[in-house]
Each structure stands twice: as structure tokens, then as C-alpha cells.
Amino acid sequence: MDDDDDSCLLDLIGDPQALNYFLHGPSNKSSNDDLTNAGYSAANSNSIFANSSNADPKSSLKGVSNQLGEGPSDGLPLSSSLQFLEDELESSPLPDLTEDQPFDILQKSLQEANITEQTLAEEAYLDASIGSSQQFAQAQLHPSSSASFTQASNVSNYSGQTLQPIGVTHVPVGASFASNTVGVQHGFMQHVGISVPSQHLSNSSQISGSGQIQLIGSFGNHPSMMTINNLDGSQIILKGSGQQAPSNVSGGLLVHRQTPNGNSLFGNSSSSPVAQPVTVPFNSTNFQTSLPVHNIIIQRGLAPNSNKVPINIQPKPIQMGQQNTYNVNNLGIQQHHVQQGISFASASSPQGSVVGPHMSVNIVNQQNTRKPVTSQAVSSTGGSIVIHSPMGQPHAPQSQFLIPTSLSVSSNSVHHVQTINGQLLQTQPSQLISGQVASEHVMLNRNSSNMLRTNQPYTGPMLNNQNTAVHLVSGQTFAASGSPVIANHASPQLVGGQMPLQQASPTVLHLSPGQSSVSQGRPGFATMPSVTSMSGPSRFPAVSSASTAHPSLGSAVQSGSSGSNFTGDQLTQPNRTPVPVSVSHRLPVSSSKSTSTFSNTPGTGTQQQFFCQAQKKCLNQTSPISAPKTTDGLRQAQIPGLLSTTLPGQDSGSKVISASLGTAQPQQEKVVGSSPGHPAVQVESHSGGQKRPAAKQLTKGAFILQQLQRDQAHTVTPDKSHFRSLSDAVQRLLSYHVCQGSMPTEEDLRKVDNEFETVATQLLKRTQAMLNKYRCLLLEDAMRINPSAEMVMIDRMFNQEERASLSRDKRLALVDPEGFQADFCCSFKLDKAAHETQFGRSDQHGSKASSSLQPPAKAQGRDRAKTGVTEPMNHDQFHLVPNHIVVSAEGNISKKTECLGRALKFDKVGLVQYQSTSEEKASRREPLKASQCSPGPEGHRKTSSRSDHGTESKLSSILADSHLEMTCNNSFQDKSLRNSPKNEVLHTDIMKGSGEPQPDLQLTKSLETTFKNILELKKAGRQPQSDPTVSGSVELDFPNFSPMASQENCLEKFIPDHSEGVVETDSILEAAVNSILEC
């Protein structure tokens, strides 16, 4: 933990004075210092934690006061404060707090105490059936506060992150809610999932309610909480059939929200498969019996990677005998109360709840997400909305709508729900009476509420307000049969590129009383088990909400006779193809005989799939669906051919809907409308191979574009399997029409060539212009009187090297002035010789000496060929020259070796030529030794690499002799340069013999020449040892000489010296001139 000046507290632990100075500063510090204002007293000045909760969060103690929940006792000396050191080094169990609000342990205690206080207040309120939430609305944190209200033991085991408090803003909720304010009390929170993220939430649309909604799970990894505090100052009235809910729910409505990626809002409340419906119709006036709203748990399942955050608000204790669960479904939300919220709808509770138009649902707003989900509202203006679960249940034909309760919400759109006339589902004031056939369709005015925009990944926008996957099938009530049909609980689709973990979309069918049917859910969804068939005129014949998972999708269906609910992660499809949401379709039914049944063949098993799935690009229902159109039949979009499922639904009465889903054959069902009195629902199934016919809403151009895109996709990823039939071959080959075209002609090629040439020419011109500009800049910089900074640096470096080389030359001139002058003159003569050889003056004289040099050169070329070097003499120079440079560097200065190094620097072209000339001139003086000079290093290199040809002592003596011979030859170079008039001729002859690429020689011949040269070197090495300078140089050069070490020295030491000498090229000339002038 570092403070502003990067001084670490751990460094100050052992020194109380330094720590006091670090904490409080010098005595003359200003009175407005952060730590001085923090209220440190003299008694506890030695304690870091004294009044740490009052300290400014931006002070240097913020890490200590935030990360440490409790400090040691006052007056604890810092020199022995080991607890501080341990707490400093350990990771804090509490979450990292922001600087907006420092940690306050009192606040945390109050938050924990508020749970009990809230429970007591709510019980008192429920008993008195009136009251205000003012008494516990004060127990809220600042919306942006991130102080932890969670015990460390609850959260630290998961991901180290803890829940953040939920900000609350008080919003008036209308005239009936004027006297009530809503506060979300921070209940006792505990983790259920793994690695729960910490996010802020705020309740933007406030509601009143007499119960709690426990929200388990997360919307896009955000924890959230809902409370219903006051219901219009009254209670929810239970008006049931005298049957109680089964007791396996344990007293709470469990609204199961499966949100694969936190976007879909399809809630499954699952209590019991065979429960009786409990309708709770209330307008704001008629209340009959006081019914305590029990703990409503809204559980939202999450994506495989997301986390679950349950927020448990303890409700009033529930009597085990009288357990009623309530399905809080789509509740009417006024526009000014909704702020990008989510109205929670449950889809599969065994008991339908009837909620009045004025009840609002608390909207959980996601502050920290950029993609708030749009709130969906269901409201009825004149009557009550009966939201039935898809389970098979008896129902008395009330004048009520059956509204599907699944809402698919786009995560990218932020639209406010319109007012009542523009709400998503709006019913006419005239309700359906018992003898009426759906004269008012639920999906009225679907376009007026600008709900959702289509996202690209969402392949099946159902309604014109794309992604308003409020796939509503208006369930109509039937007078004659008295068995109402419930709505299609279409599954919400994920939008925004999320991977659809499909929700259950139990599509419920209108059935006659005596007939049984199975509604096939979307494949890949996991839902609750359902009643398969229920007989009796007052029951739903069969409503199967168990949307079974297709086996190939790897999903599973959780089924069980006792309504098991999803609490864990939902299942994911392996094949990751976003299955579109089910299409909104209107099911026309006659009042007296509604006998359209879709019976699933027993062979399909768990592969049930209702035809209401759609994967069309767009099903634009731009015009609001008016009420009389409900009898037109169901408008069905194309079915995705994702699953091979055959649904030969057969009707016991008059209709057959056969949907044959091929693996790649989407279909479109067209429903022929029928009058209310006729039971005709006819579905024509058009199966057209890969090409699916367009829906009614598709224009011709859109369909052509769609077909082209499909053909292009098939062309890019062709099916390489065998043709099954002629039609299959035609279908698969016709898609290649998008690739039509002709081969490029000569004209096309010429045009491309011209374009390329134009571009290349322009590029070259621009490059040349840039180079010219750079040269001009360099020239201008050179002509400046005041040089630029770059030139100044270059000059400094140059001058530094010049001074170093000049001092070295001065030392050399002082030690051996004659040798220095001789080297200087030698370098000039060598330069002249190099130029003469370049002009091609050659002669045949000295062919004997050149031939004596040639076999070693060939052997060297042979050896160099292995390393990729083709110029043997040139490569030999890099070993010969550094030998002499090393000798001079160790103090045994031979003027000839320095002359050699300078010759290399003077002329790069004459590098090979100079060495060969120097050796040749030495050979004029000592013919035998000169012929052995060049092969010397090569001979020792060969023998050292082939240690089996001789003993180590013999090799060492040979190598020593070779080096002696080289130094000797160099000592004679000066005189040979002056005395030999034919040096140039000899040099050119040597270049003629060895500089040209040598043909391949036989290995035996090269080995013989190598051994001959070694023997000659041994003989010749004994002669020059009488020279004292040479012998001294040998002793200094090779004190402990071994064959391998000598080669390493040649390779490692000599080449760096040689490169160092090349850098000093220009400075040596100047130094030589200066030395001559000094002499």
C-alpha cells in the first residue's frame, strides 16, 4: 500500500517516529491536512486505526481504513503492531471499497439490524393492512455506495467479490401510490453461485407491495433485488376454487427466471405440475379476503459463465398448511414509472395470478450494464388479465384474457414502455364474454409500442418491433366448452450476440374439452414437467408445458411429478445455433367446437417441437392486429430446419396439422382463416428443400436477397457428401449461380498490368522524391553555420574516437618511431599497389611462388566451402590480420602488423590483395617461409579439427611454429616492400591463381598438401627464433598454447580487434600525418 510519495507503510513499521511523521507530517503542517482533520488525539496518536472511519477517504490511510474492518485497541504501539502487519499482508476479507464512501462498521451493523427491523415493520403492516414504508425506507444506502453489507464468511469462498448495495430512488407511482414510498431494504445476503460479481443496482420503477420477491440469479452477471411493499394500501384478494396449492412449494412463489446471458426475461415459476389455478382477479375496488403475499422468489437462471446472486429478504412466517403461491406476471406499468426496467413475467406457475391494471412491478435497473433490458408491460384497461400457466388446469370461463407471459427482451434497446394505449399487450375495454370468440385479440396494437430493435445475432425477430418476442397467442375463452385455452408462453430469445440457452416455450393449444393434446415446446429448452392429458369438460384437455430438449442439442429436461424448479445453471446447446423465438400466432377457435389438436406421435419422444418456432429473417407485422382478424387463422413463419423432428399431428376431429421438419427443410405453414362458427384450421406445409418460401411479410426483393445470401453461404461452405438424388444434386449445384462469370481475357490482364505499372511507378517516384528530400535536408544541415543537435552529437563521437586513436598513435611513435613511419609509408605504397592491380596489370612472373601458394588456397577454399564462404584468400585474411593485431595489443609492437591493420582500413577492395602481396614480398626474401605463411593457420585449423592425425604435442608445436612463421614474415614485410620491384606482378599473379573460384579438388590431394605445409612450417619455424623480438612476441602471445584454444582465440579475439581497427580508418591517416610532422 503506497501513498502519494510512494513511501511504503511496511518500511515504517519498526520506527514510531518515522511513522508518526509519515502519518501526521511535520509539526508545522497546515490545519486543513487530511489526517489532522481525521481527529487524531494525543492518546491514540500511535494507533493507525484511531478514528480511521472518520478519515478522509483520499488520505494515505484510505487503504488501512478500508481494508481493515476493525483496528487494534487504542494506544497500541506501532513498533509492536504485528496485527497491522498481518492484516497488511493478508488479503482483506471485505471487498475493495471505492473512495466515494469510506468503510463504516456502524453502517454495516445497521444494515444487518435492518433485516429484523424490516421484518417486524412488514408484519405490523400486514396485520394492520395499512401503513407506510417510511419506517423502513430510511434503511437504504446511497445508490452509488459500495460499502459492503455482507459478512466476509458468506462471500469470500467464491470469487472474493461481494455484493454491492442496491441503490434506491423514490419515485411516485401514481395517484393510488401517492402516499407510499418504496425502499429496498438490504436484506441478509448470501451467495449461492460461484464467483458472484459485485454490481450496483437501482430500482427505478417503484412499486408497493405487501410481500417480497426474492430474486435469485443475475441479469448479465448483475445481482438484483425486488420488493413489493404496498399493494395500493390493500391486500391481494384470493379468489380460488376452494383448492389450495400443493405444499411442496414451501410457501413461496418461485418465479424461475432462466437468463442464459442475462437478457431473456422468461420466468418459469414452477410449483407443481398438477396444481389447481388460483385466479386473483382484483380491480382496485373489490377486495374480498386478506391474503398475505408470501415470499416471492424470482429466480433467474444464468449463463454457464455467469453467476447467481440471491438476495434473500425474510418474509413473514408462512403457515405450512395454507400455502398459496402467486404468479406475479406481466404487470401493467405506466410509462412514467418505467426507467429501462424489467417487468418480471412468469410462465409456468401452476396457479395463474390475476393482477389488476394498477399494480406495478418493481423494475430492477442495471446501472453497471450498457445494455439495459427493456421493460415489458401487460395491461388491461377495462378488465382483469388472467395470466395462466401452461400447465393443464381447469378454469371457469370468466370474461378475462389469457395472456401469454413470456417476454423476450433485447439487451441492446432502451425504450420506455408506452402509456396504456401503446403498451405491449393491450386489451379492449370489452372483455371476452363466455359466448364470444376472441373478438379482441391480445396482440392488438403491437406496433404502437416501439419496443425493441433487431440485433444482428438475433435471427428471428418475431414482431415488427423486432425482438419484442412477446410471443403472444391470445388464449380465448370458450363459452360452450367452458374450457379456456391459455396463451402461448413463447420462449424469450437472447439478443445481442448472446448464445441462446433456450428457455421453455410451452405453446399451448386451444383444445376441445374431450380431446387431449401435447404442445411441443422449443427443442433444446429445459422446462418443468407438465400434465400430459387431463380429461373433463372443465379442464384443459392437455397442455404440456414441458418443452422437451432435443437429444442432439445436448440439453436436458428437468422433469418430476413434484414441480421441480431450476436453481442452477441452465443447459447450453452444443451446436450454438441461435434458435429463434416462437412466432406469435393467433389461434382461431370457434365458440362451440374448438377441436384443433396437435397430437405428437409417440415416436418423437423428447424431440417434440411445435411448429411455432421460426427462424426467419424478419416477420414484419407492421400493422396492428385488429380484433376481428383473430379468426383469420394463425400466421406462421418458417420453421427452422435445425432439428429433424416429424410432427404428424393428427386430429381426432376435423383438422390435421402436419409439420414435417426435415433437417434442412424449413417450412411455412399457412393457415386458412375460418369463421367463428367453423372449426377449420388448415395448415399447408410447403417443404421446398433448401429454398424456403418467403413469409407473407417478406417483400420480393427481400426474399431474393435472402436467397442469394443463402446460396452464397452454401457456395462458401459446400456440402461435399454424395448426391442422394437428382433433385438433391440440382439443389446443391444451383447455389453456384452466384459464382457465374467468365475467365479473364487478355484485355483484362492487360488492364491489370497497366494499373499495376502505374501504381508501381508512382510508388517509386514518391520513394525517390522522399530520398531526394532527405538528401537535401542533409545537405542543408551540412551547410548550416550552427549545426543541429544531431550533427553536434555525431561530431562529438567522431572527435572522441579521433582523440583515442591519436593518443594511441602517439604512444606508438614514442615507443618505435621508425616502425611507425615505416607503417605509414607502407600503407601508402600498398594503396598504390591495390590501384594498379585493379587496372588489370598482370604478368606471368612469379608463377612458381603463386603455385606454391595455390594448394593451400585450394585447401582453404575446400574448408571454407563448408561454411558457405567462396573466397578462400579473403576469409583467410580475417584470421591472419588479427593475429598481428593481438601481438601489437599485448605490447609486442611490430610495425608491420600495424601496417597490415591499416592496409585493411585504407582500402576495402585491397583487403585480399594486400595480404597476398605482403606474403609474396616476404616470400621474395624467404621463399620457403613465404610459401608456408598462408597455409599455416589453415594447417593448424585442419589438424585441430582432425585430432586423430597427430598427437596433441605435435599439433601444439606445429601451431606455435606457424604463428612464429607468420610473425617472422611480417617482420620482413617492410624491407620486402621496398626491395622487391615485382611485388605488383607477383600480387596479381597470386590473385589470378587463388582469387578465382577454385574447382572442386579431391580430398586426398588437399590433405597431402596440408601435411606437407605443416612439415615445412616445422622446419622453417626453427630459423627465426634467434630474433629476440619474435621470440618475445611468441612467449607473450601463446603462453599456454593448445590446439583447440588457439583456434578459439583466433575466432573470438582476433575478429573483434579487426572490426575495431576498421572503425578507426580515417583517424589513422590524420594520426600518421601528425606523427610525421612531429618527427
UniProtKB/Swiss-Prot annotation:
The modification Phosphoserine is found at residues 623, 980. Pfam families: GLTSCR1. Residues 918-928, 938-952 have a biased composition (Basic and acidic residues). The keyword Ligase does not apply. Residues 51-79, 509-604, 669-691, 837-877, 917-954 are annotated as: Disordered. Keywords: Phosphoprotein. InterPro entries: Chromatin_remod/trans_coact, GSCR1_dom. GO terms for biological process: chromatin remodeling; negative regulation of cell differentiation; positive regulation of cell population proliferation; positive regulation of DNA-templated transcription; positive regulation of stem cell population maintenance; regulation of transcription by RNA polymerase II. Coiled coil: none annotated. It comes from the Eukaryota. Residues 544-576 have a biased composition (Polar residues). GO terms for cellular component: chromatin; GBAF complex; SWI/SNF complex. Residues 68-79, 590-604 have a biased composition (Low complexity). Component of the multiprotein chromatin-remodeling complexes SWI/SNF: SWI/SNF-A (BAF), SWI/SNF-B (PBAF) and related complexes. The canonical complex contains a catalytic subunit (either SMARCA4/BRG1/BAF190A or SMARCA2/BRM/BAF190B) and at least SMARCE1, ACTL6A/BAF53, SMARCC1/BAF155, SMARCC2/BAF170, and SMARCB1/SNF5/BAF47. Other subunits specific to each of the complexes may also be present permitting several possible combinations developmentally and tissue specific. Component of SWI/SNF chromatin remodeling subcomplex GBAF that carries out key enzymatic activities, changing chromatin structure by altering DNA-histone contacts within a nucleosome in an ATP-dependent manner. This is BRD4-interacting chromatin-remodeling complex-associated protein-like. It comes from Homo sapiens.
